[in-house]
Amino acid sequence: NKKISDMRAELKKRHNADWSKEMQRFTTKRNNKVDDYIQKATKMVIDFCKENNIDTLVCGYNTGWKQESDMGKRVNQKFVDIPHASIVWRLSYKCETAGILFKTPEESFTSGTSFLDGEEPIKENYDKSRRVHRGLFVTKKGEEINADVNGSYQIMKKAFPNAFADGIVGAGSHPIVVNIPL
């Protein structure tokens, strides 16, 4: 985006034009790289699911969430360019082909409610201040949990409300890191 913005400003100044063949080539090349990466990344996810007998994939989704982002001009330029909907669509398609159930629950209020405290991910329980640092969430009991792990469990709870009805020992306290080489 920054490169295109610079090219457009220069073109406007010199030739009073908005678009050029060079900008089109640059955009096409970038889009092809992004599509290639999405293809490879989603294939890795599906292959991982198959190898580990995972029959359901859950991916939280908020409609229009990038349009309301306010992270500053530069960060917004980079963030809005990430084709999240394309990734979700590609995962959905590949899951269907592989016989894997794909669910996309709405993910609002999952990052500010506590899984370990048994809170429902609803507006009444939402408290943004418990996310104390980037990547760290503190429960009402004072326990610390990785914020992404907490949010993921809450998204799973939205997709499958009875998933943790029998409890889960040490949930979120001992996450497993899975490295997938690119």
Functional labels for PLM-detected ranges:
Residues 1-85, 165-182:
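Substrate-contacting helices/loops that form the catalytic groove of nucleic-acid
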